[in-house]
């Protein structure tokens, strides 16, 4: 099989879902902007050579419906001969898009693919039109469909305290704010047009979701939101609601060498795994174990790790069971995570992979891992290697 390489990766800034910069910008526009932007950064790549576009999106309705991948590609003015498909593995959708595109290249069905994802959680809320089959209650607890309650359960099972969660959340904001001030996000963010508070157009070039004023003391004052009587998970220790898109340009290693483009990373291993829906946030553990085994590597070999921060109560048990708690400050979510940046569902998989690759370059790292949990009990993981 062919080796698959990442040639470039980009994302929009993360906009606040409630009254944020992208409140008048549609999901298709965020996606099309990235599609055009990533190709503009790589003029050696002829767009007509792209075989397919794989684009993650969870809430495929309203402006995100009817194959938002194809709609965005047409809006971007890409050649009509390029295919496009919208992928849905809930929170792991754009990482699944990466896996799907990679497999097409590995098997020889494609040489170049454009992958990514989008979610406008302001325009299409996470709970819009949700209608679970009543019969699922015979097999899965109703609470398993409520992500915050699964985080409560996972945190309790692993003895994660409220204080640990508050500290983890404050760390996320502090690191994301420092990364912004020091320009560490600059190479991965494509400035994107939005609207200021007074309605005027402006170009957003930073994540507006980060709250630099966040402290452990401030977080400790928040009330539990999912289990008010006995819970520990608050809005402050949950991933923020945000709007955004992410994109990656991938191709076979042979094609990259032929075009003379810089290879930023190779895909070394990929995996998905299922787990109990009642503790859906544990999915990164079995998914990571499978991906590492396929890559012939161990968790100790990973130099940099991006673990999507759906909830602090979910991230900490995963870090514990993957043996990462003692190396958090050296390896894990070094530029903060979804608690600070937000978790636009269909965008996040390629977003954390983009952040990971930029961190690997900054640290001259050899191996990196991106992994995330998925609602109703799944996990997904990708191991990357720098050339």
UniProtKB/Swiss-Prot annotation:
What InterPro entries does the database record attribute to this sequence? FadA, Thiolase, Thiolase-like, Thiolase-like_sf_Thiolase, Thiolase_acyl_enz_int_AS, Thiolase_AS, Thiolase_C, Thiolase_CS
In the UniProt record, does the keyword Chaperone occur?
no
Its recorded reaction(s) are: an acyl-CoA + acetyl-CoA = a 3-oxoacyl-CoA + CoA
Q: What general EC class does the enzyme of this chain belong to?
A: transferase
Principal localization reads cytoplasm
Q: Which GO terms describe its cellular component?
A: cytoplasm
What EC identifiers does the entry list? 2.3.1.16
Please state where this protein is localized.
Answer: Cytoplasm
Q: Which GO terms describe its molecular function?
A: acetyl-CoA C-acyltransferase activity
Could you provide one GO biological process annotation from this protein's UniProt record? fatty acid beta-oxidation
Keywords, sorted A to Z: Acyltransferase, Cytoplasm, Fatty acid metabolism, Lipid degradation, Lipid metabolism, Transferase
Active-site residues are: 91 (acyl-thioester intermediate), 343 (proton acceptor), 373 (proton acceptor)
**Subunit-structure text:** Heterotetramer of two alpha chains (FadB) and two beta chains (FadA).
NCBIfam families, A to Z: AcCoA-C-Actrans, fadA, PRK08947.1
Query: To which protein family does this belong?
Result: Belongs to the thiolase-like superfamily. Thiolase family.
Q: What is this protein's record name?
A: 3-ketoacyl-CoA thiolase
Which organism is this entry from?
Answer: Vibrio vulnificus (strain YJ016)
Source organism lineage? Answer: Bacteria, Pseudomonadati, Pseudomonadota, Gammaproteobacteria, Vibrionales
């Amino acid at each position: 099989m062919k080796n698959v390489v990442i040639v470039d990766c980009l994302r929009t800034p993360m906009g606040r879902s409630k009254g944020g910069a992208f409140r008048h910008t549609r999901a298709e526009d965020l996606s099309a902007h990235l599609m055009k932007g990533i190709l503009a950064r790589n003029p050696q790549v002829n767009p007509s050579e792209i075989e397919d576009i794989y684009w993650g999106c969870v809430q495929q309705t309203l402006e995100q419906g009817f194959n938002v991948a194809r709609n965005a590609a047409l809006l971007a003015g890409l050649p009509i001969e390029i295919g496009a498909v919208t992928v849905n593995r809930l929170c792991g959708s754009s990482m699944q898009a990466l896996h799907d595109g990679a497999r097409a290249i590995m098997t020889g069905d494609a040489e170049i693919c454009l992958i990514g994802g989008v979610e406008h959680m302001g325009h299409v809320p996470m709970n819009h039109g949700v209608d679970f089959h009543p019969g699922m209650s015979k097999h899965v607890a109703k609470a398993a469909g409520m992500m915050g309650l699964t985080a409560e359960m996972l945190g309790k099972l692993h003895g994660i305290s409220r204080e640990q969660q508050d500290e983890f959340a404050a760390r996320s904001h502090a690191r994301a704010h420092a990364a912004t001030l020091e320009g560490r996000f600059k190479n991965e963010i494509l400035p994107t047009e939005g609207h200021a508070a007074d309605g005027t157009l402006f170009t957003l070039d930073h994540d507006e979701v980060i709250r630099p004023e966040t402290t452990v003391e401030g977080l400790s004052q928040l009330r539990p939101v999912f289990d008010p009587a006995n819970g520990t998970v608050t809005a402050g220790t949950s991933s923020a609601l945000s709007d955004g898109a992410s994109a990656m340009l991938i191709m076979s290693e042979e094609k990259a060498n032929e075009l003379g483009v810089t290879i930023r990373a190779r895909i070394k291993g990929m995996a998905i795994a299922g787990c109990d829906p009642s503790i859906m946030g544990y999915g990164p553990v079995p998914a990571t174990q499978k991906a590492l085994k396929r890559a012939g590597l161990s968790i100790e070999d990973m130099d940099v790790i991006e673990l999507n921060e759906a909830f602090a109560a979910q991230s900490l048990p995963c870090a514990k069971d993957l043996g990462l708690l003692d190396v958090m400050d050296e390896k894990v979510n070094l530029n903060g995570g979804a608690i600070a940046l937000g978790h636009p569902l269909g965008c996040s998989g390629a977003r954390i992979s983009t952040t990971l690759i930029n961190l690997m370059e900054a640290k001259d790292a050899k191996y990196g891992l991106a992994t995330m949990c998925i609602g109703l009990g799944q996990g997904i993981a990708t191991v990357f290697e720098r050339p």
